[in-house]
From Swiss-Prot:
Subunit description: Heterooctamer of four alpha and four beta subunits.
CDD domains: Asp_decarbox
Amino-acid positions noted as binding substrate in the UniProt annotation, renumbered to this chain: 57, 73-75
Places the protein is found: Cytoplasm
Encoding gene per record: panD
Record-given protein name: Aspartate 1-decarboxylase
Entries under SUPFAM superfamilies matching the protein: ADC-like (SSF50692)
Keyword hit for Cytoplasm: yes
Pathway(s): Cofactor biosynthesis; (R)-pantothenate biosynthesis; beta-alanine from L-aspartate: step 1/1
Top enzyme class: lyase
Cofactor note: Binds 1 pyruvoyl group covalently per subunit.
NCBIfam families: panD
Amino acid sequence: MQRVLLASKIHRATVTQADLHYVGSITIDAELMAAADIVEGEQVHVVDITSGARLVTYAITGTPGSGVIGINGAAAHLISPGNLVIIMSFVHLDEAERADHRANVVHVDADNHIVTIGSDPAQPVPGAADQLVGRV
């Protein structure tokens, strides 16, 4: 049996642009993609913390170091510049693979620059006063 587990998460990124007339997808700074181990064309889930919108799309590589998080195509109706989002990818693993699996969790600052890289998906962004630890 295979299970679908979190592979990576870019946590609390700020949307920098939205282009309704682009063909689709989400543009992500190449440095963030590398840190999260997300590759161009990979399916990603986007959760908008600000509006509650959720969608599935694919990743397009943005300029390294730019901090770009661009919502493209019809998704621009749901997610706006300035909104905070969580970008996640998932992996199918069998039981043997699951034992050693650790997600890549990338925390970013307000400019979408990397603050920390870890493996605990319940860990809040370090120093963020408005977040609760996901484990009790």
